[in-house]
Every structure is written in structure tokens, then in C-alpha cells.
Amino acid sequence: MPHQKQNFSQLRLNYNFNKQNILTQNNDKNLMSVNKKILNSIKQKPYFSKGDFVLYKNDCLKLLAQLPENSIDMIFADPPYFLSSGSFTCQNGRMVSVKKGDWDLSNGLSRDFEFHLEWTQACHRILKPNGTIWISGTYHSIYQCGVALQINKYHILNDIAWFKPNASPNLSCRFFTASHETIIWARKDKKGKHKFNYKLMKEGDWPEDFIKKPKLQMRSVWSIYPPKKEEKTFGKHPTQKPIDLLLRVVLASTDKGDIVLDPFTGSSTTGLACALNKRKFIGIDTEKKYLDLSIRRLNELIKKQKSKLKL
């Protein structure tokens, strides 16, 4: 019998709300039963916990240092781009400052690079031997991240060009319009055997990609629109990623039941992608308002999924 092409919408909405649902509210004393040992190693109480979706409010370096070695299957990181130092962009036809917050202020080339070295090193320790990390960034930061990965002995697997079809124009008219971000995918150890769900990436019924053709391997240029209006219902993070992007990342490199961590979780799009596909999620951020936004987004997701099951 020929292999049946998997439907993308089914992949996104594949939850059954039953007693085994990982989004079911757990007692604080029973956090993430499969990962109880991991969470018990963290001294502070979670900012929020619902089933296998857990958030912490703290500096990621402090939290990562408390996690057990070789305990995380996959990490997605969207670290500060350090753009908030006088730059401008175009928004709705107007020139606006790109200052995202004090957390995005540059401390100079050396200090910024030292930061990337520190957090990637901390992530390397907690990844499982065959674990992988994805890092998203623009040209302002991604090259420093790439060098930091190599210094910390990761093995780079791919660099993905996330092409944005509706990118903002360049106001100065002196440069090419920046219409993509780069995502680096790397393995913890050069000799490891990382997870890659090749068949799903090749044969899944994904939205049409830039230069993608049927029955060919998925390529490293992904055409995905920035977050849709409905993804910003409760507000947005200034570097919020679209759910379609994180769904692809999560489904490409993890299996059901795997533990995914986001050290700069923001509005927790990574966590929502995990919740939709039965992965366990740990998110870390320093900003209360973005953790609260994450909680509202998760609760809305649960509400929508319950409504769909009643139809």
C-alpha cells in the first residue's frame, strides 16, 4: 500500500483531550511526571505549570545551570539580536524605532559575543548526546552565534533561510531589503546521531515553499509569513515567530514525548508547537509580561481545541 501523504492541518490539531492530555492541569507537587527528576533539580518554583508546559521567570543562565546534564532532547533559541541601539525600521509605512527593550541593547561586540558563548555552552551541557539546537537570528547576531557554536564543539547540520514574503521595505534605499532570517541547526556532538524526521519533511502536506517542488526533499529555504493577526490576539513579542515556523522545527527534529527547551521563550510559540504535538516544554524568560502573554496564548489554544472536539 503506498504511503499516505500526511495532512498539515491534522498535524497542527492532533490533540485528543482525554485523561492523558499533557495540557491537563497537574498538581504542583506532581509537575511533569515524566520529567519530575529534571524539574526537581530547579530550586525555584515555576512561574506557571499546566501539564507538560512549564515556564520559569529568571535569567536563562541561572536556570540552565540547575538542569541535569544530558537531559534535554531539543532546544530552540531566539536570543537577543542586540538591535535596540538607535536603529529604525518601517512599520505601516512609518519610520519607527526598533528598540525592543533593555534586554536587546548591545553591550559592545566583545560583551555580546561573550554572552552568546555563555548561553550556548550552558545549552551544550544539558542537551542529550544526540540532541540538537536551533538558533534564529538576523545578520546582526547570527554569525556570532555560529562561531560560538563551533567554539563550544557543536556540529552544524544546516543553516535555514527563513524567507519572509511580506518583508518591510528598506527606508534608506541604500541597501537590499532584508527579507529573511537565518536559523542554524546544530548537533551537540559531531559523532552523534541526531533525530530528523526525513519522511515527514519530504512527504508531508506542507504549505507551499519558496522554490519547493512536489516529491523533492525539503530544502533549506522556507517561505513562511510572519505571525498572522490571530497569533497576536493578546499582544505580541517584538521578535515573535510564526507558529508555522516552529511547527516545522519541532516536527523535524523531535518525537512525541521529547523534552524541548526555549531559553528565551518570549510569547512561547515554541511551547505552543510542542503542545500541539505532544512534546514536553520548558520555557525561560526574564519578562513577566511575555510570560503572561504565553499563558494567555496557551489557554486560548486549549479552549479552541476543546471547541473543535465538540463539533
What are these regions (language model features)?
Residues 41-50, 295-311:
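Short, conserved SAM-binding/catalytic segment
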Residues 1-34, 40-293:
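Core catalytic lobe of class I
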